[in-house]
Curated annotation (Swiss-Prot):
The keyword Nucleotide-binding applies. It is found in: Cytoplasm. Pfam families: ParA (PF10609). This is Cytosolic Fe-S cluster assembly factor nubp2. Binds 4 [4Fe-4S] clusters per heterotetramer. Contains two stable clusters in the N-termini of nubp1 and two labile, bridging clusters between subunits of the nubp1-nubp2 heterotetramer. It comes from the Eukaryota. GO terms for molecular function: 4 iron, 4 sulfur cluster binding; ATP binding; ATP-dependent FeS chaperone activity; metal ion binding. It comes from Xenopus tropicalis (Western clawed frog).
Length: 270
């Protein structure tokens, strides 16, 4: 699939990754946020497009919920979450009058905003655009894929937890990707065990290995397991940069490894 010649505001974006999950509560927005931070610390310019219209949590995760979106000649200027302007973010959370307002919209209005997000945000030059989607396979997902299709997305990253219910939902997500022609770049198993901070033993609080087995059976890459980590939860609650502040934490090696694999996939083949 060729990239559109008239790319508009996405013409300077090198790689677009959609982060999907079959169900809510698996930590999809967490993975989106932490991968963006890890890519940023690898020297890349990263944008995050939050199209989870009914649950926009990323502004809080990046301590950006009090910031405003401004207009320029080419559309909306995204919110920059660091002084170096190496991470930019667009979310409906910035457009609500009050942060606790509910988005009670029917499909056509949601789809129209998603199309506007895809065309009217002045991202500038980015190495990666991470698109955080709602759970499931709904109108919003179809609208997102259709809006980004002309720009040849790198693919979809699927997030699951070890339980059979979550893995079953991701199977349906794989079917969605196949039907819409969206390449799957990998599966991540989140909340995969708890590492004791004292003895470093990993206890599988849920089940084990569901995401890896699904990746094997589906013939898609398995990018790794991210364990439950109180420091990761703390950083998200406080809007801190987990990758920078907690390099010795249990989840850090897994997140760094996932980011490295994405960088390898994005590198030109020799």
């Amino acid at each position: 699939m060729e990239r559109s010649q008239d790319g508009g505001n996405l013409s300077g974006v090198q790689h677009i990754i959609l982060v999907l999950s079959g169900k809510g509560g698996v930590g999809k927005s967490t993975i989106s946020t932490e991968i963006a931070l890890a890519l940023r610390h690898a020297g890349k310019k990263v944008g995050i497009l939050d199209v989870d219209l009914c649950g926009p949590s990323i502004p809080r995760m990046l301590n950006a919920q009090s910031k405003d979106v401004h207009q320029c000649d080419s559309g909306w200027v995204p919110v920059y979450v660091d002084q170096e302007k190496s991470i930019s973010l667009m979310s409906i959370g910035f457009l609500l009058e009050h942060p606790d307002d509910a988005v009670v919209w029917r499909g056509p209005k949601k789809n129209a905003l998603i199309k506007q997000f895809a065309s009217d945000v002045a991202w500038g030059d980015l190495d990666f655009l991470i698109v955080d989607t709602p759970p499931g396979t709904s109108d919003e997902h179809i609208a997102t894929v259709d809006a980004l299709r002309p720009f040849n997305p790198m693919g979809a990253l699927l997030v699951t937890t070890p339980q059979a219910v979550s893995v079953g939902d991701v199977r349906r997500e794989l079917t969605f990707c196949k039907k819409t022609g969206l390449r799957v770049i990998g599966i991540v198993e989140n909340m995969s065990g708890y590492v004791c901070p004292h003895c470093t033993e990993c206890t599988n609080i849920f089940s084990k290995g569901g995401g890896e087995e699904l990746a094997r059976l589906s013939g898609v890459p398995f990018l790794g397991c991210v364990p439950l980590d109180p420091l990761l939860s703390q950083s998200l609650e406080q809007g801190k940069d987990f990758v920078q502040e907690f390099p010795n934490s249990a989840a850090y090696p897994a997140i760094s490894s996932i980011a490295r694999q994405i960088l390898d996939m994005a590198s030109p083949r020799s």
